[in-house]
UniProtKB/Swiss-Prot annotation:
UniProt cross-references to HAMAP family, sorted A to Z: 23SrRNA_methyltr_KL
GO MF annotation terms: 23S rRNA (guanine(2445)-N(2))-methyltransferase activity; RNA binding; rRNA (guanine-N7-)-methyltransferase activity
CDD domains: AdoMet_MTases, THUMP_AdoMetMT
Gene expressing this chain: rlmL
Keywords, comma-separated and alphabetical: Cytoplasm, Methyltransferase, RNA-binding, rRNA processing, S-adenosyl-L-methionine, Transferase
Any one GO CC term of the record: cytoplasm
Residue ranges constituting the THUMP domain according to the UniProt record: 46-157
SUPFAM superfamilies in the cross-refs: S-adenosyl-L-methionine-dependent methyltransferases (SSF53335)
Name this polypeptide is given: Ribosomal RNA large subunit methyltransferase K/L
Cellular location(s): Cytoplasm
Enzyme Commission code(s) on record: 2.1.1.173, 2.1.1.264
Length: 750
C-alpha cells in the first residue's frame, strides 16, 4: 500500500471552510472543499491525527479506489477487484454505507447489498468462512459514494461519527451536535480569548455542550481522546505503534492543559431538570474543576469572573418552530440584549440563532455574521462587541430624548408581596428598568394602541367590561387583532398574502410585539400570539397547544373561563357580547336553545337572566365539558342541559319547543361524528326551517354567522318575519370592522 492516501472528511453543511483550515493545520495537504466535505492527501500519521484532533469533522474516510460505473455489474466488479485480504480477516464483520444514485442504482439499500456481496465473495474461504454484517460495531465500515458516474470506495477510519465525543449521554430537547458547537466557538474567537485568559459564560447552557467544547479547547484536550473503538481498530492496515505514539502525545498535552490555572467557564440554565444532566456531562468530560453550572434565568444573568476578566458570552437561544412562540421568544431575545448591555459591557458575544430577525431585537448590532446549518435548518451566528457604540437606541429617539430617559428611568412595581414582622404587606421598592426601544414603525403602532385605549376607555369603564378588542388591523401593515382579557393580551396575526415579503411581515410582527407591553401597560409574559388563516373542516377547533391554563373573566355579571393558549379561539367570541347581553335581558322564564353552542357562554347569560331552562347542543365533547365548567362556575344546576351531537340531526330528532333560540353556526364543518358536510351558505334554509319548527308560538330565533360573503336566502324573508339587527349587535370595540358578523331576528309571521 502507498505511503500517502486520499482522504475525505465529512462535516455539517457550512463548516467546510473551517474544517479545511483545521485539517490543513493538522497536516492534510492539497486540501479542496466540497459540499459538506473536504478532501486532501495525507500519510497515516496525519490520518490518525485527524481522527484524534478534529473538532469539526464527522468522519475521516480513506479512499481505496475510484472507478467509472455504468451499472450494477460495474459496481460489483469494481469492488471485487480490491484486495480485501489486505483490509479484513475472512471471519471479520462489515457494515456498508452507500450514498448517491444513478448508473442503474436508484436504491441505496440495493447499492449497499452489491458492495457487501462483492466483499463477501472476495473473502469467502474454501471452508465457507466469510464476513458477516454488523451494522453497530463492525470491524470494517465501508463507504461507497456514487457521484456523476464515478464510484468512490472508502474505509471509514472514524467508526462512529466523530461528533460523538462520549461525554454527552444526557441531552436536552434541542441539542447542538458537538462539532457544530465547536465550530461556533472557533468562529466566535474562543481559542484566542482563552489563550488570553478570558472567561466564557452561556446564559442558556442546556446540558452544557458549549461549555464542554470550550473547556476542551482551553485545556488543549483532543476531542476524541476518550474514544475506545475506532473504524481502524480491526483494520489490517492499522499501525498500532504509530497510533499509541499519537495518543500518548495527546494524553500528555491534556495533562499539561488541565494542570494550568482553569479558565473561568460558567453556564446558567432556567430549567432545573437540565442542571444535573449538564453537570454529569461535564464530569464525564473530566472538566468539573473548570466548568460550573447554576440554575438561573436570562433576566438575572450577570457573569462575575474571579479576576474580573472579560470574555465571551455564547448561547443558542430557542428559535420558535411552534405556532405562537413568537411573543415569548421576542421577549427572551430582548431580555438577552438588556442583560448584555447592563451586565456584560466590553465583553464579546456570540448568538447562534435560526431566527435572525429575533437576533435584531437584542438592541445591539452584530459586527460579523456567519451562515451555518443546524441539521436542515439554516442558521446565523451573530458576533457582537458589547460596547455602547454598538447599542441600537431606536430610530425615533433624538439625543435630547435619550438624555431625558437616562435622567428619568421608568419605574415598575414588583408584583411579589412581602410581609413585615407584624404580617402586614411591605410596599416594595420600585425596580428601575430600561426603556423599551421601539423602531419608528413600532412607535407608530404603540401610538395607535394608546389612542384606541383612550377612545374606548370611557365606554369600557361605564359598561364594566373585562374583555374587549383594542386593535383590529387598523394599520394595514400591522395585520393583527389584539384583545384584552383583563390583564392578559391575546394577539392574532392574520396570515399575510403571498404578495407580501415574509421577512418584512416578520419584522413588522416583531415591531408590534415589542410595542404591545409598553403601549398597553401589560407584562410581556402575559402576551399570547396566534396566527389566523383560512381553516378547513374542523381545523379551526383543533388544539394548538396543551397548557390547559384557564383564566376567569367577567361579562354582564357572569363569570366565564377562557383559554388563551391551547386553541385558535379562546372560548369567548368577543364580537357576540351584545347578543349575549340581549339574550340575558330576554331570557326570563323562557326555554332557551343554543345551537352550535361552543362553550355555551350564551347559555350562561340566559341562565343568569332567569331562563326556565337552557339546552346547549354542540358536536365537541371538549367544548361541552368547558360549557359545564362555565355553568358550574356560576352556580347553575342540571336544568341546563348539554347535548352532544350534530345540530342538523339533533333538530330532526327533537320534538321539544323553545321560546328563545340562538344559532351561531360555523362557516363550514365536517367531522367523523356528523352526517355529511355543513356549509352555512348552502344549508341555511334547512337549518333555520328545522329550528323554526322547534320555536314556540311568540318565540324569537336569533341567527348569526361570521362568513363575510354570506347572503341570507330571500325565501326565508317570504316564509318568516326577518329583521337584520347587525348594527345593534356591534359594540364600539368592533365598530372598526362592521363585517365581523351578521345577525338577524327571525319570528313566525303573524
Amino acid at each position: 500500500m502507498s505511503d500517502r492516501y486520499e482522504l475525505f472528511l465529512t462535516c455539517p453543511k457550512g463548516l467546510e471552510g473551517l474544517l479545511a483550515e483545521e485539517a490543513t493545520a493538522l497536516g492534510l495537504q492539497e486540501t479542496r472543499e466540497h459540499t459538506s466535505a473536504i478532501r486532501g492527501s495525507a500519510d497515516m500519521e496525519t490520518a490518525y491525527r485527524l481522527c484524534l484532533w478534529s473538532r469539526l469533522a464527522n468522519r475521516v474516510l480513506l479512499v481505496l479506489k475510484r472507478f467509472p460505473m455504468k451499472d450494477a455489474e460495474d459496481l460489483y466488479h469494481g469492488v471485487l477487484d480490491v484486495e480485501w485480504h489486505d483490509h479484513l480477516e475472512p471471519e471479520g464483520t462489515i457494515a456498508v454505507e452507500f450514498s448517491g444514485h444513478g448508473s442503474g442504482i436508484d436504491n441505496t439499500h440495493f447499492g449497499a447489498l452489491k458492495v457487501k456481496d462483492a466483499i463477501v465473495d472476495k473473502l469467502r474461504t474454501p471452508e465457507g468462512e466469510r464476513p458477516s454484517v454488523d451494522k453497530i460495531n463492525p470491524d470494517l465500515r465501508v463507504h461507497l459514494r456514487l457521484d456523476r458516474g464515478e464510484a468512490i470506495l472508502s474505509l471509514d477510519l472514524s467508526g462512529h461519527s466523530l461528533h460523538q465525543r462520549g461525554y454527552r449521554l444526557q441531552q436536552g430537547a434541542a441539542p447542538l451536535k458537538e462539532n457544530l458547537a465547536a465550530a461556533i466557538l472557533i468562529r466566535a474567537g474562543w481559542p484566542r480569548i482563552a489563550a488570553e485568559g478570558g472567561a466564557l459564560a452561556d446564559p442558556m447552557c442546556g446540558v452544557g455542550t458549549f461549555l464542554v467544547e470550550a473547556g476542551m479547547i482551553a485545556a488543549d484536550i483532543a476531542p476524541n481522546i476518550k474514544r475506545e473503538r475506532w473504524g481502524f481498530s480491526a483494520w489490517l492496515g492499522h499501525v498500532p505503534t504509530l497510533w499509541r505514539k499519537l495518543h500518548d502525545e495527546a494524553l500528555a498535552r491534556a495533562e499539561a492543559g488541565l494542570a494550568k490555572t482553569p479558565s473561568w467557564i460558567r453556564g446558567y440554565e432556567a430549567d432545573p431538570r437540565l442542571i444535573q444532566p449538564g453537570r454529569n456531562n461535564i464530569e464525564r468530560a473530566g472538566l468539573s474543576d473548570w466548568i460550573k453550572v447554576y440554575q438561573g434565568e436570562v433576566a438575572t444573568f450577570e457573569p462575575r469572573p474571579d479576576q474580573n476578566q472579560k470574555g465571551l458570552v455564547i448561547c443558542n437561544p430557542p428559535y420558535g418552530e411552534r405556532l405562537g412562540d413568537e411573543a415569548s421568544l421576542l421577549y427572551l431575545y430582548q431580555n438577552l440584549g438588556e442583560r448584555l448591555r447592563q451586565a456584560c459591557l466590553n465583553w464579546e458575544a456570540a448568538v447562534f440563532t435560526g431566527a435572525p430577525d429575533l437576533g435584531k431585537r437584542m438592541g445591539i448590532r452584530s459586527h460579523k455574521q456567519y451562515s451555518f446549518w443546524n441539521g436542515a435548518l439554516p442558521c446565523k451566528l451573530l458576533l457582537i462587541k458589547v460596547t455602547p457604540d454598538q447599542f441600537v437606541t431606536g430610530e425615533r429617539r433624538t439625543p435630547e430624548q435619550r438624555q431625558v430617559e437616562r435622567e428619568n428611568p421608568v419605574e415598575v412595581e414588583v408584583v411579589e408581596r412581602k410581609l413585615n414582622k407584624n404580617g402586614n404587606p411591605i410596599k416594595p421598592e420600585p425596580v428601575v428598568v430600561e426603556q423599551a426601544r421601539l423602531s419608528e414603525g413600532g412607535q407608530m403602532f404603540a401610538n395607535r394602541l394608546q389612542k384606541n385605549l383612550k377612545l374606548l376607555g370611557k365606554w369600557v369603564r361605564r359598561e364594566g367590561i373585562d374583555c374587549y378588542r383594542v386593535y383590529d388591523a387598523d394599520m394595514p401593515e400591522y395585520s393583527l387583532a389584539i384583545d384584552l382579557y383583563h390583564d392578559w393580551v391575546h394577539v392574532q396575526e392574520y396570515a399575510a398574502p403571498k404578495s407580501i415579503d415574509p421577512e418584512k411581515a416578520s419584522a413588522r410582527l416583531f415591531d408590534a410585539l415589542a410595542a404591545i407591553p409598553q403601549a398597553l401597560n401589560i407584562d410581556k409574559s402575559r402576551v399570547v400570539i396566534k396566527r389566523r388563516e383560512r381553516q378547513s373542516g374542523t381545523k379551526q377547533y383543533e388544539r394548538q397547544s396543551a397548557q390547559g391554563q384557564f383564566l376567569e373573566v367577567s361579562e354582564g355579571g357572569v363569570k366565564l373561563l377562557v383559554n388563551l393558549t391551547d386553541y385558535l379561539d379562546t372560548g369567548l367570541f368577543l364580537d357576540h357580547r351584545p347578543m349575549r347581553m340581549r339574550i340575558q335581558r330576554e331570557a326570563a322564564g323562557k326555554r332557551f336553545l343554543n345551537l352550535y353552542a361552543y362553550t355555551a357562554t350564551a347559555s350562561v347569560h340566559a341562565a343568569k337572566g332567569g331562563a326556565r331552562s337552557t339546552t346547549s347542543v354542540d358536536l365537541s365533547r371538549t367544548y361541552l365539558d368547558w360549557a359545564r365548567r362555565n355553568l358550574s362556575l356560576n352556580g347553575f344546576s342540571d336544568k341546563n342541559r348539554l347535548e352532544q351531537g350534530d345540530v342538523m340531526a339533533w333538530l330532526q330528532a327533537n320534538r321539544d319547543e323553545y321560546d328563545l333560540i340562538f344559532i351561531d353556526p360555523p362557516t363550514f364543518s365536517n367531522s367523523k361524528r356528523m352526517e355529511g358536510i355543513f356549509d352555512v351558505q348552502r344549508d341555511q334554509v334547512e337549518l333555520i326551517d328545522l329550528a323554526m319548527a322547534r320555536l314556540a308560538p311568540g318565540g324569537v330565533l336569533y341567527f348569526s354567522n361570521n362568513f363575510r360573503k354570506f347572503v341570507l336566502d330571500e325565501n326565508l324573508g317570504q316564509r318568516y318575519a326577518v329583521e337584520d339587527i347587525t348594527a345593534q349587535t356591534i359594540d364600539p370595540d368592533f365598530a372598526r370592522n362592521g363585517k365581523i358578523h351578521r345577525a338577524w331576528k327571525i319570528t313566525a309571521r303573524a
